[in-house]
Structures are given as C-alpha cells and as structure tokens.
Amino acid sequence: LVQMDIVLGNVAANQAKAQAMIEEGCRQGARLVVLPELWNTGYQLQEIRNLAEYEDGSSLGMLKRLAQEYCIEIVAGSIAETDGTHVYNTAYVIGQDGGIHTKYRKIHLIGLMAEDRYLSPGNRRCLFDSVAGPAGLIICYDLRFTELPRAMALAGCRTLFVPAEWPSVRGRHWVTLNVARAIENQLFVIAVNRVGKDLDNDFYGHSMVVDPWGEVLAEGSEKEEVIVVDVNFAAGEEIRSRIPVFRDRRPECY
C-alpha cells in the first residue's frame, strides 16, 4: 500500500516519489501494489485538462515498466485520463506483464471537491481477475454508495480495491465505511488513502486492509509510508461460510 503525500500539479515529482515507494515495497517482497487516487496530480482540478494524460502518457508508462521489471500487479490508484474530449478520474490495473488489464472511470463524482464541475463520470463497474482473486475497483466517494459494492459482490467480487483522497475531517467515515463494506459483502477491502494537504484539505491516510470478518489486518498512520501486508485471500471462503448471508438473503422481499 503506497500511502503518499502528493505535490499539487507536479507530475514529475509525484512520479518520482511513487516509483521510489513502489520499489521499496518490492524490496520488502510485495507482489501487489496499490496507489491512491489522483496520485500523479492531486486535486488540481482547475488545471486538470492540461494535466490529464492519454493511456500512452508518462505516468502509466512508468508503472507499466515497473510492473514488468518487478513482476508485480499494480492497482494504479487513479489519474486524470483524457480521451481528447472528456476528462475522467480513472483507475487502472496493470498486470505483471506490463499491460493494462482493465480500467475503471469513477462513477460518483463528489460535489464537495468540485469533481462534477471539471470531470465526466464513468458509467460501468469494474470486475477483474487479480493476484488477490476475483476483484473489483471503486474510487473514494464511491465507497458511500452501498449498491455498487453489493452488486460487485453478487457478481463474484472477493476483494475490493479503494484508492482515495479522503480528508481528515471525515476520517471516522473512512474507517467505518471500509469495515462496513467488508462485513456486509463478506470480502476483503484494500483501501489506500493519501496523506498531507492541498489548498483546501488535510488528508487522513489510515490506508488499510480489512478481512471479510471486519478485522483490520493492517492500518497506516497519517504519515507517508509503504505498508506491506501478507494476506491469505483463500481464508475468505471460510469466513463467508460462517454466516452465509448470500445464501439467506431474500431480495424478492426488498
């Protein structure tokens, strides 16, 4: 888990920091690396059209090279992605072969941080096969919408990745929602938040891994750090068998 501070609008500085922290994780044996939301720019939304990258841009190029060099899977947080017309808050998954395996455009844009003024929303959920098993991907504000993780769990998701830029003022929500999503959907949650501050917000950090029983297996501080966690994803099946909510649910009554 790459819990990093982000220099607002300074892509080169953020790329250098992300690379150093990824390499530190690899030295500690990481096979899967997760970055925070908008890790290469931060919420520099007034300049986001100038900062946005195509898929062949330098930020993803760096991550593709690192994934292949170290034989790791990277859940590449998110970056501002342009298709030439629109700009999206887009998370990518880069495989051990250095290729883009999937991407997810953030569905729920948060008005409190003016995303809806500068970005376009996505309209498709994201499920993929990960080294962590069947996985899903949401971004930050999406965490508040219970329907999306539930639909993903019903479709087979067993690990939910949540890159974020979550402010300290709502820090209690961050912890509570990550644990709740893990318990109610009986899946692992791997949530990576930034630290530091921008012009308007202090960011909470506390990146975490939560198991399907709601136990927090690891939790970061409010400082920059690389958090390496050994997770037995296969243990999720035993946890799910204890309280078989998906067997017992009665959606026809809801």
Language-model region placement:
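Generic N-terminal amphipathic, Lys/Arg-enriched alpha-helix
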Residues: L1-L8
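Short, acidic/polar
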Residues: A13-I22, R144-R150
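Short beta->alpha transition motifs characteristic of CBS
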Residues: T41, I48, Y92, Y104-I110, ...
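Short beta-strand scaffold segments in enzyme catalytic cores
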Residues: A76-S78, T90-V93, C126, S207-V209, ...
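Active-site catalytic loop in hydrolytic enzyme cores
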Residues: T82-R158, P163, P167-T176, F203, ...
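A conserved C-terminal secondary-structure "cap"
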Residues: E237-Y254
